[in-house]
């Protein structure tokens, strides 16, 4: 009699089965077990390009790969591979314009896909299993919608935004950044791990084009105040007024589409929203 599989083996078998090309059922979260948070200062052995121009987006957005021409050579996107070995970078017909930082299980990505059908949206998530869940979720949605080509415009990437955001995006490339229900890091000694800070806001200002918007939402009043304080203190951002904020369709999606947002709703909690517009670059 065969021994019963333990939970870890069941998870591994399930995820291996999800890699088959004919799977049409949505992945189940219980097979993608992961800690709630990850330390952004740890060495996660992440893969990242040395420069945005050397990022190969073709595997993430295969429907948007440009026709083959003379493609520039690039170094491999890895900290462990031989950086002297050149590789070909397949260009896309358009750039990624929207980033969901800490995308979790991908609720916002999936909701934005039909609302922004002509825009490439990327989820950035540091946790391995959660990233795999979102990847499998998008693959299934693409298979289910082969005729309409829906969900080809969204993808997910395992990345540490606190360290490597400028490695993926050129100056002014993004029109929107979403920061939804980030880890509040309640202890004062952990505040340096918060995804909004003076230093990180400068990186957001670099990646977001003038007129672009950073969207924030949390159910923690203290963290909301922290994010507002740090963005309002930054010379390249201004807070968007309440009337304009509530008229933005992305705000309603952000409130209700994320898994954390739904959890807060079930618990009858309060959601705090703030938007910040990227100002024009100063003229010297």
Swiss-Prot record:
Q: Where in the cell is it found?
A: Nucleus
- Its predominant location is nucleus
User: Which catalysed reactions does the entry list for this protein?
Assistant: guanosine(46) in tRNA + S-adenosyl-L-methionine = N(7)-methylguanosine(46) in tRNA + S-adenosyl-L-homocysteine
What positions constitute the catalytic site? Answer: 183
Q: Name one GO molecular function term.
A: tRNA (guanine(46)-N7)-methyltransferase activity
**Assigned protein family:** Belongs to the class I-like SAM-binding methyltransferase superfamily. TrmB family.
Q: What is this protein called?
A: tRNA (guanine-N(7)-)-methyltransferase
User: Which lineage is the organism of this entry classified under, starting from the top rank?
Assistant: Eukaryota, Fungi, Dikarya, Ascomycota, Pezizomycotina
State which gene encodes it. TRM8
């Amino acid at each position: 009699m065969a021994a019963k599989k333990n939970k870890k083996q069941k998870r591994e078998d399930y995820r291996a089965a999800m890699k088959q090309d004919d799977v049409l059922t949505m992945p189940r979260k219980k097979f993608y077990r992961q800690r709630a948070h990850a330390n952004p200062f740890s060495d996660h052995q992440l893969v990242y390009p040395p420069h945005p121009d050397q990022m190969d987006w073709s595997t993430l957005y295969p429907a948007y790969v440009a026709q083959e021409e003379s493609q520039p050579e690039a170094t491999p996107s890895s900290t462990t591979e031989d950086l002297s070995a050149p590789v070909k970078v397949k260009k896309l017909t358009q750039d990624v314009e929207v980033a969901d930082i800490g995308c979790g299980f991908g609720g916002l990505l999936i909701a934005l896909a039909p609302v922004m059908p002509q825009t490439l949206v990327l989820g950035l998530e540091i946790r391995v299993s959660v990233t795999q869940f979102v990847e499998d979720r998008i693959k299934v949605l693409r298979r289910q919608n082969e005729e309409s080509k829906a969900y080809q415009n969204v993808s997910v990437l395992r990345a540490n935004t606190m360290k490597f955001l400028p490695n993926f995006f050129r100056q002014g490339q993004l029109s929107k950044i979403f920061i939804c229900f980030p880890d509040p890091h309640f202890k004062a000694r952990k505040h340096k791990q918060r995804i909004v800070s003076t230093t990180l806001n400068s990186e957001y200002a670099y990646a977001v084009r003038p007129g672009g918007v950073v969207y924030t939402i949390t159910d923690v009043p203290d963290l909301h105040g922290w994010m507002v304080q740090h963005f309002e203190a930054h010379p390249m951002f201004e807070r968007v007024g309440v009337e304009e904020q509530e008229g933005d369709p992305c705000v309603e999606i952000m409130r209700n589409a994320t898994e954390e947002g739904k959890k807060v709703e079930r618990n009858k909690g309060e959601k705090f929203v703030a938007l910040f517009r990227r100002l024009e670059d100063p003229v010297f």
